[in-house]
Design a protein with these regions (language model features):
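Intrinsically disordered or highly flexible coil/loop and linker segments, enriched in small
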Residues: 17, 34-40, 102, 121, ...
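Short, solvent-exposed positions on alpha-helices
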Residues: 18-22, 41, 60, 132
Length: 167
């Protein structure tokens, strides 16, 4: 995570930065191994149905959803499962990516939003995904097997809010 947080903006800014590209290759490999072993979550739960319904690149959809899903998970965990170890994992992720040892779990969300903005990743609306589609997307996402790996079950209202925030 630390490697990707450092290298992605550098590789994006200068595609000839071989060290940054090497770090991103390793981060991608490690991320894939982690996902294969730990399971997926709501980001991929949404990405599957969205990819089937719209001509939208999987990676861009995942990036557009990451901060809103993180925010929804943090809110749901704080409200319904405040003792969940997932909150400590989010806090550790925030500390790693921000470089701030005092960072809290909610600090992760603005960091993710800023990264997506700096990388120029389009929001879901860019792909023609709008509020009229949200109920169908949320319904399909709620049934996706990837949702089983989310740290907490999200309500239909929370799923709709994620889509609105990513739109």
């Amino acid at each position: 995570l630390a490697r990707a947080a450092r290298a992605l903006p550098r590789a994006f800014a200068d595609g000839s930065d071989l060290a940054a590209r090497t770090d991103m290759s390793l981060a991608s490999l490690f991320g894939g191994l982690a996902l294969a072993n730990a399971g997926l979550g709501a980001v991929h739960g949404f990405a599957g149905p969205l990819g089937g319904m719209f001509d939208a690149p999987h990676g861009a959809v995942c990036a557009a959803l990451l901060a809103p899903v993180t925010a929804a998970n943090l809110s749901a965990l704080a409200t319904r499962a405040p003792e969940s170890p997932a909150l400590a994992r989010y806090r550790e992720a925030a500390r790693i990516v921000t470089g701030d040892p005092a960072a809290t779990a909610p600090d992760l969300v603005p960091w993710l939003l800023d990264l997506v903005r700096r990388l120029g990743i389009p929001r879901l609306g860019h792909y023609g995904i709008g509020p009229a589609d949200f109920a169908a997307i949320a319904g399909k996402a709620s049934q996706a097997s990837s949702m089983k790996g989310n740290p907490i079950g999200l309500t239909p209202e929370e799923l709709m809010r994620v889509l609105a925030e990513a739109q």
